[in-house]
From Swiss-Prot:
Protein name, per record: Parathyroid hormone-related protein
Gene: PTHLH
Protein task: Neuroendocrine peptide which is a critical regulator of cellular and organ growth, development, migration, differentiation and survival and of epithelial calcium ion transport. Acts by binding to its receptor, PTH1R, activating G protein-coupled receptor signaling. Regulates endochondral bone development and epithelial-mesenchymal interactions during the formation of the mammary glands and teeth. Required for skeletal homeostasis. Promotes mammary mesenchyme differentiation and bud outgrowth by modulating mesenchymal cell responsiveness to BMPs.
Biased composition annotated in UniProt, kind: Basic and acidic residues: 99-108
Residue ranges of the propeptide: 15-24
Phylogenetic lineage: Eukaryota, Metazoa, Chordata, Craniata, Vertebrata
Pfam families: Parathyroid
GO BP, sorted A to Z: bone mineralization
């Protein structure tokens, strides 16, 4: 035990153990900082790429119509096409009741009374 305490308090290579610990903590925090910085740069590049891609998608329809007939009227932004999701039965049943023939029966409310106690032990 005495040798351990002496070796622990004696500086190694001119540096104390506390200084080495601080250096290690600083290295870890610098590594984390660089990692976070790289992550934010990557996120910024991804956002820029998606923004550029979305801008191309929004202008693709205008470009396509202008290439086909340059003198014609541009297509309106709003379309009156009916959009359908799902089937006609969608609003009739709850998801748990799909394909059930029985109708819903109300169950009697429980009256407040004795509560079950857990088993001791």
């Amino acid at each position: 035990v005495g040798v351990f305490l002496l070796s622990y308090s004696v500086p190694s290579c001119g540096r104390s153990v506390e200084e080495l610990g601080r250096r290690l903590k600083r290295a870890v925090s610098e590594h984390q900082l660089l990692h976070d910085k790289g992550k934010s740069i990557q996120d910024l590049r991804r956002r820029f790429f998606l923004h550029h891609l979305i801008a191309e998608i929004h202008t693709a329809e205008i470009r396509a119509t202008s290439e086909v007939s340059p003198n014609s009227k541009p297509a309106p932004n709003t379309k009156n096409h009916p959009v359908r999701f799902g089937s006609d039965d969608e609003g009739k049943y709850l998801t748990q009741e799909t394909n059930k023939v029985e109708t819903y029966k109300e169950q009697p409310l429980k009256t407040p009374g004795k509560k079950k106690k857990g088993k001791p032990g």
